[in-house]
Amino acid sequence: MKIDLNCDLGEGFGVWQMGDDAAMMQIATSVNIACGFHAGDPDIMHATVKLAKQNGVAIGAHPGFRDLHGFGRRPVPGITSAEIENLVAYQIGALQAVAALAGHKVTHVKAHGALSNVACEDDMTARAIASAIKAVDPSLVFVVLANSKLMLAGEAAGLPLAHEVFADRAYEDDGNLVSRKKPGAVLHDPNEIAERVLRMAQDGAVVSVTGKVIKMRTDTVCIHGDTKGAVEIARGVRRKLEASGITVAPFAGT
């Protein structure tokens, strides 16, 4: 059995840094790099790509709504399909150019924050993201929340998919993530999270906040770099998986 560990990195801005990218880069096998709209800038993007190349880690674009102040975690009411396509294509292209400068290659795309959350439940948003990815490069792997409208849009567009589960987030009974506004939405206990991820990988399922077992294909597990104790959590998850005979490797080539 093989599984990927992915992490959202490069989410600082200017002199401000978010999380310990250098440490996470030694644990993750794929990283999703902010492309300047919700976080990141050209220098941070370039430094993050170089760090990924040095560590043999696959890189992907992490496009979000243009909302630095809100870290891309606030929906944009009234945004059109064309506007979503444009902002996704723009951000993928930006990372592709920076990656070329650093001698690395973008292999996948994963939507960030509110853009992803809305797309998991809204057909128009999901289709617009998938359409933009396909137009830019149909070989890019689309990282999607398992069992979501993002997944259905990716399938309809004929894109290669990586089905994602979240190590440090709680799930509702319908398979969507519990809103960060609710208590208990983000998990922090490293041992609990490691055991949870092992069950996800072995059983192909997640357990909701009410105890409901939801079958989900698991190609990649996300550990958020901005979660408190992220490095310890990620290290514990990888150690638990490898100790159980599961190969931790990227879903796309580096």
From Swiss-Prot:
Q: Which cysteine pairs are joined by S-S bonds?
A: none
Q: Which InterPro entries match?
A: Glyco_hydro/deAcase_b/a-brl, LamB/YcsF/PxpA-like
Per the record, the GO terms for biological process are: carbohydrate metabolic process
Taking the record's annotation, the residue ranges forming a coiled coil are none
Q: Which organism is the protein's source?
A: Rhodopseudomonas palustris (strain TIE-1)
Recorded name of the encoding gene: pxpA
**UniProt-listed Enzyme Commission number(s):** 3.5.2.9
Quaternary data? Forms a complex composed of PxpA, PxpB and PxpC.
Catalytic reaction list: 5-oxo-L-proline + ATP + 2 H2O = L-glutamate + ADP + phosphate + H(+)
Any Pfam family hit: LamB_YcsF
Q: Which family does it belong to?
A: Belongs to the LamB/PxpA family.
Q: Name one GO molecular function term.
A: ATP binding
Protein name in UniProt: 5-oxoprolinase subunit A
The first-level EC class reads hydrolase
